[in-house]
Each structure stands twice: as structure tokens, then as C-alpha cells.
């Protein structure tokens, strides 16, 4: 039995955090499918979804072959046209990153200066002073 499937009240959740149970960690299941199944999935994706439906886990569908083809394209426009032709809104790698950030309760803050643009990762719900502590480490 996975700790993700157990319903706990707030006090119990706090106590469980101290145990650092591996089965309480967020899980992302990535299903690599063929091109025909990349939009809606297939019976195997459905089986994974059914198996983990009570786990508070995410199931993501990606076509590794499609991702390889996208990586070979030169321009953003070419990549967008390729994705549109397949009925996709974004590349699988982008979905993977976005889903992982969501699952881990993370957000990104961007800073821009004359020499560089940086992305800073912080936990959702952090206050501005805490986030500033990540950005301004000097």
C-alpha cells in the first residue's frame, strides 16, 4: 500500500512528513506511446491511469519518436507547425517540465538584466522575502 493512497488530516500529515516515506512522494508516470496514441492515449495508458487513480499521481503521455523529430527542427515556427499537424499544443518535454513543476508545487520567477536572463525556482506559497533570499544570495 502506498502512503499516497491514505487519507490523513492536517495533524497526521505533519507527523507523516517527519517519516519521509518514499511512497508519500509525488509520482509522475510517463507513458511513451506511438504517434497515433500521443493525443488521447491507448489501452495501456488507460491501464496505467486505472492502476494509479487513487495515488494522487500524474500520468503523462509522450511520444519519444515525436520528441526526437522535434529536436531536429531548426526554428520555433517549424516546431509549432509540426506539433499542430499532430494535433498537439506543445512538445512533450515542455509538458513534462510543466507537470513536474506542478507536482512538486514549484513556480518560476524570471529576472532580466543587461547581460543575462535568469529563471529562479521557488515553492508556491513562499513569501516575497523568502523568494528574494533565493534570488539575492550575495
Model regions and ranges:
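C-terminal-of-GTPase-core extension/linker across diverse P-loop GTPases
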Residues: 1-138
Amino acid at each position: 500500500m502506498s502512503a499516497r493512497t491514505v487519507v490523513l488530516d492536517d495533524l497526521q500529515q505533519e507527523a507523516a512528513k517527519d517519516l519521509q516515506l518514499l511512497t508519500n512522494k509525488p509520482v509522475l508516470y510517463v507513458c511513451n506511446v506511438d504517434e497515433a496514441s500521443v493525443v488521447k492515449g491507448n489501452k495501456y495508458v488507460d491501464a496505467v491511469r486505472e492502476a494509479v487513480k487513487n495515488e494522487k499521481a500524474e500520468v503523462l503521455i509522450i511520444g519519444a519518436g515525436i520528441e526526437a523529430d522535434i529536436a531536429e527542427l531548426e526554428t520555433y515556427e517549424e516546431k509549432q507547425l509540426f506539433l499542430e499537424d499532430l494535433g498537439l499544443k506543445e512538445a512533450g518535454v515542455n509538458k513534462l517540465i510543466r507537470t513536474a513543476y506542478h507536482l512538486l508545487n514549484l513556480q518560476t520567477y524570471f529576472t532580466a538584466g543587461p547581460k543575462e536572463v535568469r529563471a529562479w525556482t521557488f515553492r508556491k506559497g513562499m513569501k516575497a522575502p523568502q523568494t528574494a533570499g533565493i534570488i539575492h544570495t550575495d
